[in-house]
Each structure stands twice: as C-alpha cells, then as structure tokens.
Amino acid sequence: MDMNTFPANTYCDSIVRFLDAIEYHDDNLTHDERVEGLRHVHSRTAQYFTEPLPRKVLKDVAPRRIAAVTRTISHFIVYCWSKLPREAQVDVSIYLSIINVLDDEISSEPSTQMATFWTDLVQGKQQKHPFWVLFNSHLPRLLRHYDSFCSFNIMRCTFDYFEGCWIEQHNFQGYPGADCYPLFLRRLNCLGGAVAGTIFPAAKFDEQKLFAEISCVMAQIDGPVALVNDLFSFYKEYDQDEANLVTNWCTVDGITMDQALTRLTDDTIHACVRILEILKDKDPDMLATIRGFIHGYVTWHICDFRYRLREIYDREDLGGSSAKFRDYFDTAINVGWVDVEEWTCQVQGFEVDGPVPKGSEIQAYRTNAFGFSVDTRRPHNMDYVGSSIISMFEWVTGYLKGKSR
C-alpha cells in the first residue's frame, strides 16, 4: 500500500477509541523502578548470551542483533510483567530473547532439522534445530518459577509459536473464503499462552485455588496480546508486502484495509475490555496483573518508536481525535520513557550510521525493536564477533560486581 493513502485520521480515532475504552492509565512503576528493573533484567539477559551454549549455537548471528534483541525484550518484560519477581523476569526475558534471536532460523524451511524432532524429544536425544537446542537448556530454568498448569501452557505455546513461524515462512495468506485461517495463524504465533503462563508465578499465585480464573485467562489472553500489537503495528506495516492478520483478513474476506482497521479496532477493544470485566470480581491480584500487563503493553508500544507513532503525532493534517491522541502519546512518554544510557550497556560494533545519535534516538529507531536495523553489508568476522561479545561480557561483569558490593 502507498503511505500517501494511509487513513491517518481514522487511525488516530482508532487509537483514541481503544485507549478511552480501557481507560489508559499506566501506574505500574515509578521512573526509578523502571530504571532499576531495566538495568537488572537487561544485564542478566545479556549475560546469558555470553554463556558457552548460546555462544556456540549463535556463532553466526551478528552481535548487534543479539544486543538489539536483549534491549527490546528487557524493555518489554519490565513494562508488561511489572509485577513479576525479578528473577522470573530475567528468565522470561531470556525465553523471549531466544525466540526473537532465532526468528530467522525458524522462518527458513525447518523440515529437515525437524524430521526426527518428536523421536528425539521422546527418547531424550539432542535436538537438531538451534531453537530447540537452546530451549532444551533454558526451559527447565524458566519453568522452576511456575506450577504444573502454567508450565504446561508455556510449553504448549512454545510449540505453537514454532509452528506459526513454520507456516509464515511460506508467506501464505489463506484462500479466499478461508475465514478461520487469519486468526488460526495469529493465535499460533502471538505467544498468548506464554504470556498467560509466565505472568502467574507460583510464588504469588496458588494455581489450584485459582485454577478456574487462570484457565479463563488462558482462553481470553490471545486477543489482548495479539490485537493490541496489531493495532499499534498498523501504521508501520501499512506499506509492507507481508502476510499479517490485517492483510490476511483482506485476502480471505475481500475487505479493504480501512474496513480491516475498523474490525481490528473493534476486536481489540472487545478483547481487552472483556478480560478485565471477567476478572473485576475475581482475585484482585490477578485483575491487577492483567490490567498492569495491558496498560504496560500500551506504554511499551508508544515508547518503542519502531512503531513510528511519533510520525502520526507530528502530522499537520489531522483533525478529529488528534488532540486527544497527542495527549495520550505525551502521557505514555512521560510515564515510560527511559533514555537508553540509563540502563543498557554499550557494546563495541553496534554503532549506527551517520552522526552520533542521542540515546533516545538509538532506543527509538535502532536498538529497541523487534525488527532489527542490522548492517548486513558489513562482514561479521570472528574477530569482530569475539570482541563484541567480550565487550558485552566485560560490561555485564562490571555491572554485576557493582551491584554485589
């Protein structure tokens, strides 16, 4: 699609309508709490990637990609899993970082490496695909924070995510009339089950006592996790020729992008309002946890400028809800913005092109995103890889020593 045809006013109205519906007000953390959480979670997540197994498995992955992932995911975890104990936050951050670092590996045809997957799994043999090699090592570390039902859902969702990426690498948008396909694929790869599983640690939630409530969250959570992301991604993905929920709807249902945006907005509002309404007279800690996730999720999207909402903010041709959109944007930035220098390590070799940018610019456009601006023209030889990882390790070690004093 041509960005010149982007329905900016309609999109502005959609964001405002959604934020009005959930009564957006992120009071999860103070600024100092965000900084402390980001420093701890990021340093420990970065440290994981200096360990022997991930270094071996990821030897061909550019270090700046790993650095970008660890920054993004640390930011995501601290803002959305804000009520999780710190060590559980670290292990969830590592879990999602592995997924994002290896996304390209899943998106290349995995059939050969997966040929003996189930036999190897049942017989306890070494897996062949790098995704599962790393997860076989990390999952026990993650699951120790959770009881059996939440652990089961984390595992289920991990399998679902891999399958969703396997399907997506074919860039198949579904046949006309296959109306179940778009949401089927979106549920597979949205990681809703992992969110619901990891957000209720055994230390804070009695799984047996709250089994019905947790089961209900498992059923409802895919909508908030997937659709909020799709709504905030609508602008940046408008001119990209990629299969996603919105373009898949257009393909299978024969609707326009404007109609798809209206559907997406309505469904996002319904999903978020419904889960909060269901929980409002249930366990108060569970309600606070889900509300905190949704509101933190909004803050994270607005503070991650890869979603390019600043471009909407700066447009001079907006009417209607533009003033309220800007108010919400300013509120989220005031609550959630933390300059990258306050919490993350600087790693040799991760420079960006052009003049030396300020930390906010680095965070916004280069290092704090799920889509990575890696300079693929530059060869990543072993000296470069080694020195970059060593620099990261030295920074992390120094930081942890300082914390232990």
Curated annotation (Swiss-Prot):
Belongs to the trichodiene synthase family. A motif (D(D/E)XX(D/E) motif) lies at residues 103-108. Mg(2+) 3 binds at residue 241. Its EC number is 4.2.3.-. A motif (WxxxxxRY motif) lies at residues 316-323. Keywords: Lyase, Magnesium, Metal-binding, Virulence. It comes from the Eukaryota. One of its GO terms (biological process) is sesquiterpenoid biosynthetic process. Pathway: Secondary metabolite biosynthesis; terpenoid biosynthesis. It is an enzyme of class 4 (lyase). The conserved active-site motif D(D/E)XX(D/E) is required for coordinating the divalent metal ions that stabilize the PPI moiety of the substrate. InterPro entries: Isoprenoid_synthase_dom_sf (IPR008949), TRI5_ascomyc (IPR010458), Trichodiene_synth (IPR024652). Mg(2+) 1 binds at residues 103, 168. GO terms for molecular function: trichodiene synthase activity. It comes from Penicillium brasilianum. This is Terpene cyclase pbrA. Its cofactor is Mg(2+). A motif (NSE motif) lies at residues 227-237. Mg(2+) 2 binds at residues 229, 233, 237. Terpene cyclase; part of the gene cluster that mediates the biosynthesis of the sesquiterpenoid aspterric acid (AA), an inhibitor of dihydroxy-acid dehydratase (DHAD) effective as an herbicide. PbrA cyclizes farnesyl diphosphate (FPP) to produce (-)-daucane. The cytochrome P450 monooxygenase pbrBB then converts (-)-daucane into the alpha-epoxy carboxylate intermediate which is further converted into the tricyclic aspterric acid by the cytochrome P450 monooxygenase pbrC. The fungal sesquiterpenoid aspterric acid (AA) is a submicromolar inhibitor of dihydroxy-acid dehydratase (DHAD) in plants and is effective as an herbicide in spray applications.
